[in-house]
């Protein structure tokens, strides 16, 4: 859907969805679109995973999510000299004794690359955090949270 320019005060992109776009060119186009639909001074809030940490430490499995109803397993296959990682998931539905599996490629976008793309799209006041509490970015944590403005 196309939105009018300068329509929104805030745009959100959470849940590591941005990196489903599999090239920097695609991400740049999306970010420029977000910039266009924000009102002057509007805010863009973004959350992906901290791929500097994931790649640097060769993290191959994300924390297990388990409730009384489901068990959700998430793994990464890191490929040498390839900006894409293979993201594999298994969702076990306990009551039905059924497992649904999936695999997709994600662009392992590092923090410096993301900041550069945001700047190229026109964003300013770019701040990155290690979580939604706005704790300092860096170190061994999975989230990468961004706040920036038009």
Residue ranges and their predicted role:
Residues 107-150:
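C-terminal lobe and adjacent flexible extensions of AdoMet/dcAdoMet transferase-like proteins
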């Amino acid at each position: 859907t196309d939105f009018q320019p300068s329509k929104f005060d805030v745009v959100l992109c959470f849940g590591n969805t941005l990196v489903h776009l599999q090239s920097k060119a695609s991400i740049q186009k999306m970010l420029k679109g977000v910039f266009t639909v924000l009102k002057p001074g509007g805010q863009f809030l973004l959350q992906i995973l901290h791929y500097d940490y994931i790649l640097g430490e060769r993290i191959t499995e994300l924390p297990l999510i388990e409730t009384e109803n489901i068990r959700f397993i998430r793994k990464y296959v890191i490929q040498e000299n390839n900006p894409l990682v293979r993201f594999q998931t298994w969702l076990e539905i306990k009551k039905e004794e059924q497992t649904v599996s999936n695999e997709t490629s994600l662009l392992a976008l590092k923090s410096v690359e993301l900041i550069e793309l945001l700047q190229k799209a026109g964003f300013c006041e770019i701040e990155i955090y290690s979580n939604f509490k706005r704790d300092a970015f860096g170190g061994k944590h999975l989230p990468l949270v961004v706040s920036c403005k038009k």
